[in-house]
Amino acid sequence: MLRNDSHRAVSPEDGQGRVDDGRPHLACVGALARGFMHIWLQAATLGFAGSVVMSRGPYANAASGAFAVGCAVLGFMRAPPPLARPTARIYAWLKLAAGGAALVLWSLGEPGTQPGAPAPGPATQCLALGAAYAALLVLADDVYPLFLLAPGPLFVGTLGMVVGGLTIGGSARYWWIGGPAAAALAAAVLAGPGATTARDCFSRACPDHRRVCVITAGESLSRRPPEDPERPGVPGPPSPPTPQRSHGPPADEVAPARVARPENVWVPVVTFLGAGALAVKTVREHARGTPGPGLPLWPQVFLGGHVAVALTELCQALPPWDLTDPLLFVHAGLQVINLGLVFRFSEVVVYAALGGAVWISLAQVLGLRRRLHRKDPGDGARLAATLRGLFFSVYALGFGVGVLLCPPGSTGGRSGD
């Protein structure tokens, strides 16, 4: 295998200060690719287990509420310290155990249900809920350092992996297949990530490349001590503090600029809660006044909200000022327009409220992440957990609204069961 010349240097560091362990660049690329694929598979497992939990059944409403609330709450948890890394592997084993038990019970059939029925029984849903919680904890631990301190392209790639995995796994109920094929598919999705984590994959890269992916969220990229080249993965002695230049600004002038204001964190939280409550209320009013099937275009509307967020981020790159706060007034104006159209185009109003909730929530969280990343805040652990929890809450809202919009009597893409 061809090796890069810069990685064959005798010195442990190259001219740019990067640690040289003699590995080819291809090995690092492969380790990082496996790590991101692991994140995608973990998100797909979470979405697939969530679709099983939210399948129609005698306890569908309770299971769906427990799943949505649990995803929102567990997403805000801080990641364990580096010494508690085996905790994530315990969650991975619990996911395999609970998911495997749910698959076996579904295949054999519970009392009162047929083997392989599209609508799982209560015990199967409870086991699937446990597997979903375990998958969420593993996924939250994997993406924890990537939500605040990672560079922009790496963060966007991580978010794309999470969104793609959740979409594929969560949409399983719409293309559910029966018989042994469904059991084989469920087993493949469950066993795909295995009992490992994405950090295990990232740790196989060289110290220079894995540093961004496994850095503790409470640290800063510039403050992290270099790793010992003799023992990869072990931090070396802390770097001496950089002396302040005599012509630079005083310390008391630059310190406040590096501290995130509390309102920067709570504005997206309040925005999400308000937009989510308004969307759920609109859906309930529509379901009450319109008997029969729900809104079949909800998955497209949810995806359209993401497209609107992507366009907003592209527009944000053009002007020199931040558009995050003005977007709140745009969203308020759209809601006023919806109130005027509710009596003539009720279904369009529901779609607009749902898509607007997804759009404004993600836009505010992305704006918060952009500002915090520039400021390099000291309390990175709390802020990274807040960002991750807000993202997961948006998708928990999407799952919950999807259940409210599911036509009565439909189970996993079939009707009449």
Swiss-Prot record:
Keywords: Membrane, Transmembrane, Transmembrane helix
GO cellular component, one term: viral tegument
InterPro entries according to UniProt: Herpes_UL43
Region (Disordered), start-end ranges: 1-21, 217-254
Stretches with biased composition (Pro residues): 232-243
Bilayer-crossing regions: 57-77, 90-110, 119-139, 146-166, 175-195, 263-283, 291-311, 323-343, 348-368, 389-409
Subcellular location: Membrane
Major location (coarse): membrane
Biased composition (Basic and acidic residues): 221-231
A matching Pfam family: Herpes_UL43
Bilayer topology annotation: Multi-pass membrane protein
Family that this chain belongs to: Belongs to the alphaherpesvirinae HHV-1 UL43 family.
Protein name as catalogued: Membrane protein UL43
